[in-house]
Amino acid sequence: MIYVDDAGLMKHDRAWFHLVADSLDELHRFAATLGLPERAFHRGARHPHYDVPDDLRQRAISLGAMPIYTRDAVRISRKLRDR
């Protein structure tokens, strides 16, 4: 399953959100569908994710990503990281 949170962190005059998934393969495939390059993946982060701006968040949801709270995105990412 693919998820996108409600973080809405402001950076460069845009709101940014976290795209996470139950598996890295699924996450990378979905990110590619959105046009995100793999280099945009936060590989060194404590929680594996891609940052997406609001327009891509809306597109992700229309393509099947489940909107979730940020705390749930952190939990999902930690579980993935700890595998």
Predicted regions and their residues:
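Non-catalytic peripheral regions of nucleotide-handling enzymes
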Residues: 3, 13, 27-33, 59, ...
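A short, structured beta-strand/loop element
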Residues: 21-46, 62
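Generic signal for short, ordered secondary-structure residues
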Residues: 9-10, 38-39, 83
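The feature represents the first ordered module of a protein
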Residues: 1-27
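Short, compact, well-ordered microdomains
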Residues: 47-83
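Terminal leader/tail segments of proteins
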Residues: 2, 33-40, 57, 68, ...
